[in-house]
Amino acid sequence: MTNNQTLVQHDWLKRWAFLGLSLLINSVGHALTVVMNLGSAVWTASAVNLYHLWPLSLQATLFTCGVVVVIMNAILIHQIIWRRIIGNLLFTLPFSVLIQWFTGLIQRTGITALPLGIRIIIDVFGVLCVALATSIYQRANLILHPNDDFMQIIRFRYLKGNATIAQMVHYI
């Protein structure tokens, strides 16, 4: 192996490690906001609302929402790119499982009995974890959550790279 190949392989492994770390941070952050029920990322809040409407688990609801967005993404780009679809699903599956697991774990701590001020701080910490994790995994640039891919598609295919407008459209 040449030095260049070794560097590329090392970089690839490091990027996957950062993706794994970001999945853990992201899942804990989302689980904190779900348990606190004081505010969350908009897509997670929507999934939690659906979870309360039907008999599916939170994990199944999050995964189902991810699959729906994967289909929407394929429609928006007018083609099926299997690498992109598989990447979105590879992100969504552990993401859904981990949020369900961490939510159950956090609920058992009795954290919801804390005073409101402390719960607000915990909820804000959860939102900050989500922001940090999203930044990490997007920099790893391996696979995306379907909702983040959706925003990127809107931004670059339809809004000439304007991130601000893409974020607003993404939430509609």
Where are the language model's segments positioned?
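Core subunits and conserved enzymes of cellular information-processing
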Residues: 2-172
